[in-house]
Design a protein with these regions (language model features):
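Transmembrane helix-loop boundary segments of multi-pass membrane transporters
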Residues: 89-100, 104, 171-181, 203-212, ...
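Hydrophobic, membrane-embedded alpha-helices of multi-pass small-molecule transporters
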Residues: 65-82, 224-231, 239-304, 327-346, ...
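Membrane-water interface regions at transmembrane-helix termini and the short interhelical loops
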Residues: 90-91, 117-118, 134, 142, ...
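Selective recognition of specific alpha-helical transmembrane segments in multi-pass small-molecule
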Residues: 78-81, 104-112, 147-158, 215-227, ...
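C-terminal membrane-solvent junction of multi-pass transporters and transport-like membrane proteins
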Residues: 55, 215, 408-480, 491-495
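Membrane-interface "cap" regions at the ends of multi-pass membrane proteins
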Residues: 18-95, 246-253, 272-281, 485-507
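Transmembrane alpha-helical segments of multi-pass small-molecule transport proteins
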Residues: 144, 172-199, 214-225, 255-266, ...
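Hydrophobic alpha-helical segments and their helix-loop junctions in multi-pass secondary transporters
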Residues: 159, 164-167, 214-240, 255-260, ...
């Protein structure tokens, strides 16, 4: 049914309304069309975005695929990429293997993110809202809940690392230690900064990420250049090749840490693109923007580490890397680290808020990010203050969610290959069943500190290949179902056509 509410002239005065359907969209009735600034009233920089999970009308579509280059570049400037490189080093790969695994794993996984982004440009809805066309409103609860927990979980981990970096700036400037409760204050600052941008919405995020990509991208390049100049490249080049199993394990780690962790948000940032935007441009700029900084950081992390390095297992990787810089570069390094991590948080916070709307939380989009920020602040504050060792287990739990996210992406990708679903299905069992079976199979082959499946043996030990097995199973099952549906409909159409033409007697 149509949304209600008269169009008003000012976006900040328009009451946000919900679609008259079982799920809210958190949208606001808006006047379509661009303002003199080139942005539509519903999505202007430094104003609260008024669309929720409703379909973005053609009059509100704006931007170009090259915007994705800066958006994804900023999101992958975080120093966590250096830690991924350290993990690759601990698996014993030589330099050539490490570079190949990093390039192929990073570009390949973000290629999937770019392809899924085409669905957002075509459908005009966020990622998990589009998923309802496959799973149905009730069947989509599972994937949406997994997506939300994964996003909020990684936001919490990122906020903690950013807060640690912010705390490290204090003794660098004052030559004194930060207080015990300073950790909570630092966490509140990092979360608050992310909230301020995420609350405003899509257009503001695009503008901010572009600035971050340019300004802090150059700063990151300078700091990376300093590290690369002082790195022991001869030691890295002298390493011996690792066996095939180690290469596969390293590739699985890179894929899971790179694009796979973003598959559930891709359409959130392409739904405003004009319908005339080319799909190849969406895929290309997404892949290039995300892969370029991350490949550089991962390879650098590999060179800086050794098979016995403690960087990969450090509870505070920012502090561990800090010792590699001269005194004058410590504060600039920490500042760049904080901003790079905040750029990741902003995108996660915005998308997790959209996920809450898909789950049926009946509040404005601009308020869903506040709910997520409170969760991040509460959970993150507990981890930073309380004396416990649960953070490692929490990270392992969030990493486990890569399996159901991968299987969901497999189902969605297959549906796109078959032309996409335009309406919610009569039954959700084909998509939901394929997702559930693939997830179960993937977990059977998964090995992690928190959970080890009964079939996680051989090459599956010490790798993240479980999600890959689940991906293949879900894709194969759903492809078989969709192919069967296409064949059946083709036969029905042929029978109907022959009946109408008189070749067959009527039933």
């Amino acid at each position: 049914m149509a949304r209600v509410g008269p169009p008003l002239d000012r976006a900040d005065e328009r009451p946000e309304v919900f679609a008259m359907s079982p799920h809210p969209d958190g949208s606001t009735a808006s006047r379509c069309g661009p303002t003199p600034s080139g942005f539509p009233v519903a999505d202007r920089p430094w104003s609260v975005e008024t669309h929720g999970i409703d379909v973005v009308p053609d009059g509100d579509r704006h931007g170009k695929p090259t915007d994705l280059l800066w958006l994804w570049s900023a999101a992958n400037l975080g120093v966590i990429g250096i830690v991924y490189g350290a993990v690759v080093a601990t698996l014993g790969l030589d330099l050539l293997q490490a570079v190949a695994v990093t390039v192929v794993g990073t570009a390949g996984s973000f290629l999937l993110v770019g392809v899924l982004g085409i669905a957002g440009q075509r459908g005009g809805e966020p990622m998990l809202a589009l998923s309802r066309r496959l799973f149905g409103a009730s069947g989509n609860v599972g994937p949406s809940l997994v997506s939300w927990v994964s996003l909020v979980g990684w936001e919490t981990v990122t906020a903690i690392v950013a807060a640690d970096a912010l705390l490290a700036i204090v003794p660098s400037l004052t030559h004194g230690p930060a207080g015990r409760w300073s950790a909570v204050v630092a966490l509140a600052v990092t979360t608050g900064l992310s909230l301020a941008v995420g609350r405003l919405g899509h257009a503001t995020i695009i503008v901010v990420q572009r600035a971050v990509a340019w300004i802090f991208g150059i700063a990151t390049l300078a700091l990376v250049g300093d590290l690369a100049f002082r790195a022991d490249w001869a030691r890295a080049a002298a390493r011996h090749p690792a066996p095939f199993g180690a290469v596969v394990a390293a590739a699985s780690v890179v894929i899971a840490s790179a694009g796979l962790s973003w598959v559930n948000v891709s359409a959130d940032y392409t739904r405003y693109l004009p319908r005339g935007a080319r799909g190849r441009a969406i895929v290309g700029w997404t892949t290039l923007g995300a892969s370029t900084p991350l490949v550089v950081l991962v390879v650098l992390g590999y060179v800086l580490s050794s098979p016995t390095s403690t960087l990969a297992s450090s509870p505070n990787p920012v502090e561990a890397l800090r010792s590699g810089f001269p005194g004058w570069a410590v504060v600039p390094y920490l500042s760049v680290a904080v901003v790079g991590l905040l750029a990741q948080m902003v995108m996660g916070l915005y998308s997790s808020g959209l996920n809450l709307l898909v789950l049926g939380i009946r509040v404005r989009r601009s308020r869903t990010v506040l709910i997520d920020a409170l969760v991040v602040l509460s959970v993150g504050g507990w981890f930073m203050v309380a004396p416990h060792d649960f953070l490692g287990s929490f990270v392992s739990f969030v990493e486990l969610l890569a399996c159901p996210l991968a299987t969901w992406a497999a189902v969605f990708l297959v549906d796109m290959l078959f032309g996409g679903s335009r309406d919610e299905p009569r039954t959700a069992w084909p998509a939901g069943g394929s997702w559930a079976v693939g997830t179960a199979v993937g977990l059977l082959f998964t090995a992690s500190p928190l959970f080890t499946g009964p079939l996680a043996r051989g090459i599956f030990v010490g790798s993240s290949l479980g999600y890959f097995a689940g991906f293949l199973v879900s894709a194969a099952l759903f492809a078989a179902v969709r192919a069967g549906t296409v064949v059946r409909r083709g036969r029905e159409a042929t029978t109907t056509r022959r009946s109408v033409s008189g070749e067959l007697p009527p039933r």
